[in-house]
């Protein structure tokens, strides 16, 4: 598959990587965080312009949800996700696999794909590798994720092994279908990229073998999936370390669905380049806010008369203009502005955390940064 993307490793400190990822929609400085806009918008009322203002590089949209509503064909008729959302930077769409296996009811898995009931109205839907690629071609995202089977954790070793083998077969079908869609001029984005997903539950032998298999397919990037789903954090870190030596050095590496600031710092130290998580926006809507001293619950009574910003060390528009007392009032009163401001702050924090990580890697001081902040940033204060 011809590719216009280039991952360039600029600097390395132990396993931590500082790089650039070039796409048709712009160059991503890595390590980077992808901001989760499930249905084409950040929950909490942030627009594409807001994302630009807070320093976001990449937006992540959800194939399953957009397929159900408003429909991927409508998005294609509107010119694709970039025109539809007015976000002109890179967009990654997941394959829909995780939602099919976590949200949908009455699933039936076959070699062809998965039949399931919509969580919206119960109507029957079939999705397999070809369908996932067709939907993502209509969406016109920068990066399409391959359709994979997401097994429950824990799962039996034998079933996990069979699932990995099926995911590899599905990946080959995804690659072939993307090539067909491009060749026939069907894809909204003819330069769409394909990432494969490593699975294997928490079995190191399966993880390593699966990574070896999919690395041979010469894809545009590689993701580690099926983690951060309830297993102990140390087990997640161990799986990353087991898989990392077998991930192509010249391709971008993506850890799906992770995580806390501490998780991200630790995963960067273990060789990961790209992240996504709903945590910063979800936590913000409930008043749990990230600071450089740890996590505060702005709803606590002690902030009722606090005139300070959320984080005196933060330069976001929220911290430059509003007090803890005011933001607490907004959330307690269920004012929409409260959610908007807290989500804006947390996403600013995450995106600027990544910028700080890149700066530390550039300066050769990431290890010291890791040791200082990996636990501190996840501490509740």
Regions found by a protein language model. Name each.
Residues 26, 59, 94, 136, ...:
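Conserved, mostly hydrophobic/aromatic
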Residues 165-168, 177, 181-183, 189-310:
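Glycine-rich phosphate/ribose-binding loops and adjacent secondary-structure elements
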Residues 57, 142, 220, 273, ...:
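Short acidic/polar active-site loop segments enriched in Thr and Asp
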Residues 153-156, 161, 221-227, 336-339:
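Glycine- and acidic
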Residues 1-188, 301-304:
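Non-catalytic, usually N-terminal nucleic-acid engagement modules in DNA/RNA processing proteins
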Residues 141, 172, 176-179, 245-248, ...:
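Generic secondary-structure signature for well-ordered alpha-helical cores
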């Amino acid at each position: 598959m011809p590719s216009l993307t280039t991952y360039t490793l600029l600097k390395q400190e132990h396993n931590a990587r500082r790089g650039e990822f070039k796409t048709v929609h712009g160059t991503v400085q890595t390590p980077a965080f992808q901001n989760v806009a499930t249905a084409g918008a950040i929950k909490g009322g942030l627009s594409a312009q807001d994302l630009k203002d807070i320093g976001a590089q990449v937006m992540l949209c959800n194939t399953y949800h957009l397929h159900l509503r408003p429909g991927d064909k409508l998005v294609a008729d509107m010119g694709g996700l970039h025109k539809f959302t007015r976000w002109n930077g890179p967009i990654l769409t997941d394959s829909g696999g995780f939602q099919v296996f976590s949200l949908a009811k009455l699933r039936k898995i076959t070699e062809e794909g998965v039949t399931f009931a919509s969580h919206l109205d119960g109507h029957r839907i079939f999705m397999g590798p070809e369908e996932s690629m067709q939907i993502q071609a209509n969406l016109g995202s920068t990066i399409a994720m391959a359709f994979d089977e997401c097994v429950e954790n824990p799962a039996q070793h034998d079933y996990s092994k069979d699932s990995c083998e099926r995911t590899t077969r599905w990946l080959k079908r995804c690659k072939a279908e993307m090539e067909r869609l491009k060749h026939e001029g069907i894809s909204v984005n003819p330069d769409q990229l394909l990432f494969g997903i490593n699975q294997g539950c928490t079995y190191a032998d399966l993880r390593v073998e699966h990574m070896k298999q999919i690395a041979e397919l010469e894809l545009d990037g590689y993701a580690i999936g099926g983690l951060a789903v309830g297993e102990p954090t140390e087990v997640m870190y161990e799986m990353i370390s087991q898989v990392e030596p077998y991930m192509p050095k010249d391709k971008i590496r993506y850890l799906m669905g992770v995580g806390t600031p501490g998780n991200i710092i630790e995963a960067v130290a273990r060789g990961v380049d790209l992240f996504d998580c709903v945590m910063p926006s979800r936590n913000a809507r409930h008043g749990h806010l990230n600071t450089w001293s740890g996590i505060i619950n702005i709803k606590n009574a002690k902030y009722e008369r606090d005139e300070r910003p959320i984080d005196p060390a933060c330069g976001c528009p929220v911290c430059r203009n509003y007090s803890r007392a005011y933001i607490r009032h907004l959330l307690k009163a269920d004012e929409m502005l409260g959610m908007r401001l807290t989500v804006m702050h947390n996403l600013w924090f995450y995106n600027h955390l990544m910028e700080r990580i890149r700066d530390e890697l550039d300066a050769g001081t990431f290890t010291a940064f890791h040791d200082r902040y990996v636990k501190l940033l996840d501490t509740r204060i």
